[in-house]
């Protein structure tokens, strides 16, 4: 979900709309 602030991880996963519950970990 691209509504989250883009860090190096969710910049990729976030805009894919994948489950980011485990993506935000380092």
From Swiss-Prot:
UniProt-annotated location(s): Secreted
Function: Binds to sodium channels (Nav) and affects the channel activation process.
GO MF annotation list: sodium channel regulator activity; toxin activity
GO CC term (a single one): extracellular region
Organism name: Androctonus crassicauda (Arabian fat-tailed scorpion)
UniProt keyword annotations, A-Z: Ion channel impairing toxin, Neurotoxin, Secreted, Toxin, Voltage-gated sodium channel impairing toxin
Keyword Transferase applies: no
Protein name (Swiss-Prot/TrEMBL): Toxin b subunit alpha
């Amino acid at each position: 979900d691209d509504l989250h602030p883009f860090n190096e991880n969710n910049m990729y996963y976030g805009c894919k709309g994948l489950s980011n519950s485990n993506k935000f970990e380092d």
